[in-house]
């Protein structure tokens, strides 16, 4: 029965997330802020709302490992989808160059992942009031990221969307429904995890919550690529990943028992490590100025897709 309710609220959460993204796009259409701010903050924040609610709910349900799996699994899935769509849309993306704003986001992501990995490996073990060092670094770097985002009005998003009446009211109502749906979704996933003790809560969180809550980002990414706006699409994905880590730091703060990173298990550690590798590969792929051919361009994407499928289909199952 838990599985049926999970599917119901998973579809509802995805639907509400899509609606939120549409409303955010319409709201940004009349805005004078830059593409980087809209992609890195507005779209990333709106599409990451399910992660925020499900992550917080996991802590309140006293299953912090579910929260870790959710965030790390979501980030892993995001990069996997980026690589997969790189392959599918190779003709559109091959000649596209990304901005330096994306480089900044990638670098901050890599630093955050390295700090978390070193912390759980006990290379650095600094805590303040039961809050882990990674949380402090994530928060500081996120504020630096916001500060450094270009806020000029020159670079505007041009997305052909029909104006929506009373958009702010609809955005608010949809957000409230999203919160309720995400809480119930997390509750049923937690029940599934409790009824399957042979599986890690982190892995279940990564699969059921991580992938479900990431689908809005995937849809946004696909839509932006289809209208030849790869730079904004990439900014949305890496910006969402960065925002997800900020959510994880919030979870660490409200999880008062110990740093949340201390309860990570082997499966979740593997997800973290794969996430770090994927982000580095994706970063190196996007900073290249020249490629000999489409084949050499697409090799990193093939590596990411292959590793992801191997981990879930062979390594885990």
Language-model segments: residues:
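Hydrophobic alpha-helical segments, chiefly the membrane-spanning helices
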Residues: 1-317
């Amino acid at each position: 029965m838990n599985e049926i309710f999970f599917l119901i609220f998973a579809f509802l959460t995805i639907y509400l997330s899509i609606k939120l993204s549409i409303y955010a796009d319409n709201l940004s259409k009349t805005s004078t802020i830059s593409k980087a701010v809209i992609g890195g903050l507005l779209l990333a924040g709106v599409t990451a709302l399910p992660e925020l609610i499900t992550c917080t709910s996991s802590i309140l349900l006293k299953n912090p490992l579910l929260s870790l799996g959710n965030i790390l699994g979501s980030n892993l899935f995001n990069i996997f989808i980026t690589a997969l769509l790189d392959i599918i849309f190779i003709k559109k993306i091959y000649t596209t160059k990304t901005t330096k704003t994306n480089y900044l986001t990638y670098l901050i992501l890599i630093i955050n992942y390295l700090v978390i990995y070193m912390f759980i490996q006990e290379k650095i073990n600094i805590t303040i009031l039961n809050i882990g060092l990674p949380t402090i670094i994530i928060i500081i770097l996120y504020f630096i990221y916001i500060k450094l985002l270009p806020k000029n009005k020159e670079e505007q998003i041009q997305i052909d969307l029909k104006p929506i009446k009373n958009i702010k009211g609809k955005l608010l109502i949809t957000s409230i429904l999203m919160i309720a749906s995400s809480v119930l979704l997390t509750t049923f996933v937690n029940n599934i995890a409790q009824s399957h003790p042979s599986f890690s809560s982190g892995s279940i969180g990564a699969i059921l919550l991580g992938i479900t809550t990431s689908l809005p980002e995937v849809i946004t990414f696909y839509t932006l690529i289809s209208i030849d706006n790869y730079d904004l699409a990439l900014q949305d994905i890496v910006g969402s990943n960065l925002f997800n880590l900020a959510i994880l730091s919030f979870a660490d703060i409200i999880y008062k028992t110990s740093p949340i990173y201390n309860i990570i298990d082997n499966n979740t550690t593997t997800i973290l490590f794969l996430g770090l590798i994927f982000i580095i590969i994706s970063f190196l792929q996007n900073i290249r100025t020249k490629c000999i051919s489409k084949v050499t361009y697409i090799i990193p994407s093939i590596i990411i897709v292959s590793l992801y499928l191997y981990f879930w289909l062979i390594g885990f199952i």
